[in-house]
C-alpha cells in the first residue's frame, strides 16, 4: 500500500507542477504572419507616399491582437524581420512606419536589423 500511496502522491505533485506551468509555445507561426501580410506587399514595395490599404491595416491589427504573450510578440517580430530580409524591393521606411499608419503600437521597428530578443 505504501508504494501505491507514494506513486499517487508523486503523480499529484507532477500534475500540480504541469497544471501551473505556463505554456511555452507560441500561438503565432511564421506562416500565419507572412501569409497574412499579402495585402500589404504592394504598399511595402511602394516608393511613393500612398495610403495603406484598409485590408492591410486590418491584418496588422489582427496580428497585433493575436500576439498576446512575449513569446508570440517575439515570434511575430522574428517573422517580420525575416520577411523584411526576404522581400525584394521592400521600402524599409514604409515597413517601419506601417504599424503607426494603421494605428497600432508595437514594441519594435519592422526592420531587418531589429533585435527581437529584446521584445517584451
UniProtKB/Swiss-Prot annotation:
Residues 1-26 form the signal peptide. Disulfide bonds join 30-79, 40-56, 57-102, 77-116. Coiled coil: none annotated. GO terms for molecular function: lipid binding. GO terms for biological process: lipid transport. Keywords: Disulfide bond, Lipid-binding, Signal, Transport. Expressed in protoderm cells of somatic and zygotic embryos, and transiently expressed in epidermal cell layers of leaves, flowers and seeds. PROSITE patterns: PLANT_LTP (PS00597). It comes from the Eukaryota. PANTHER family: NON-SPECIFIC LIPID-TRANSFER PROTEIN 2-RELATED. Plant non-specific lipid-transfer proteins transfer phospholipids as well as galactolipids across membranes. May play a role in wax or cutin deposition in the cell walls of expanding epidermal cells and certain secretory tissues. Belongs to the plant LTP family. This is Non-specific lipid-transfer protein. It comes from Daucus carota (Wild carrot).
Amino acid at each position: 500500500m505504501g508504494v501505491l500511496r507514494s506513486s499517487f502522491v508523486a503523480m499529484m505533485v507532477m500534475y500540480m507542477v504541469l497544471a501551473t506551468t505556463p505554456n511555452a509555445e507560441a500561438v503565432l507561426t511564421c506562416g500565419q504572419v507572412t501569409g497574412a501580410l499579402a495585402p500589404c506587399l504592394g504598399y511595402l514595395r511602394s516608393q511613393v507616399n500612398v495610403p495603406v490599404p484598409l485590408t492591410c491595416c486590418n491584418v496588422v491589427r489582427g496580428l497585433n491582437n493575436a500576439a498576446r504573450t512575449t513569446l508570440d510578440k517575439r515570434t511575430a517580430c522574428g517573422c517580420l524581420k525575416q520577411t523584411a530580409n526576404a522581400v525584394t524591393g521592400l521600402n524599409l521606411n514604409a515597413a517601419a512606419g506601417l504599424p503607426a499608419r494603421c494605428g497600432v503600437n508595437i514594441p519594435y521597428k519592422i526592420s531587418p536589423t531589429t533585435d527581437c530578443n529584446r521584445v517584451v
